[in-house]
């Protein structure tokens, strides 16, 4: 190999090594998450009795929940906001991340052992059937009325959601919620 060819080869090799080193040095391995929010003194109250809802999902067959992503047993519930401040125009339930299955964003079955159903979680849904990931806010509803009657009835639901082939058993979970405003 001539000295000129060897020089070109060496320069190309060193250049590619420098480029790969530069590329490795620019890889991003850290970042930040910025949180913005707002607190308000303008609020609504949760109607007495709605602060601790119990939803009974129907007893259904595991055949209806045979594979991941299958849903069944949708059951509606409502939460009523009352006594809303005059400047509150929309209200919704924000469902906290309590009991969240990190794989699906749905609510884990808290039961364990032989009596617990397996490969099933409970999915929160808006009134149109669209899923609500735990840690998210459901659909906002318009606030209407005056005085203590100023409020909104918010309609949501829960349904079984298969994470795989389900097995027979009991399901129990819960979602904490907080009123959110627009």
List where the protein language model places each region.
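Mature extracellular/passenger domains of Gram-negative fimbrial/pilin and adhesin proteins
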Residues: 2-7, 20-182
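Bacterial N-terminal signal peptides
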Residues: 10-17
């Amino acid at each position: 190999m001539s000295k000129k060819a060897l020089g070109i080869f060496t320069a190309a090799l060193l250049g590619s090594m420098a480029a790969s080193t530069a590329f490795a040095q620019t890889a991003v391995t850290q970042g930040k998450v910025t949180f913005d929010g707002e607190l308000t003194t303008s609020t609504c109250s949760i109607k007495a009795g709605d602060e601790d809802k119990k939803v009974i999902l129907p007893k259904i067959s595991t055949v209806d929940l045979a594979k991941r992503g299958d849903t069944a047993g949708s059951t509606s519930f409502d939460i009523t906001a009352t006594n809303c401040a005059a400047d509150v125009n929309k209200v919704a339930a924000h469902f906290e991340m309590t009991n969240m299955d990190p794989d699906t964003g749905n609510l884990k079955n808290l039961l364990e052992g032989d009596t617990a159903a397996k490969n099933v979680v409970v999915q929160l849904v808006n009134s149109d059937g669209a899923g609500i990931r735990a840690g998210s806010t459901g659909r906002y509803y318009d606030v209407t009325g005056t005085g203590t009657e100023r409020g909104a009835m918010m309609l949501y639901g829960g349904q079984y959601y298969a994470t795989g082939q389900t097995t027979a058993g009991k399901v129990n979970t819960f979602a904490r919620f907080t009123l959110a405003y627009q």
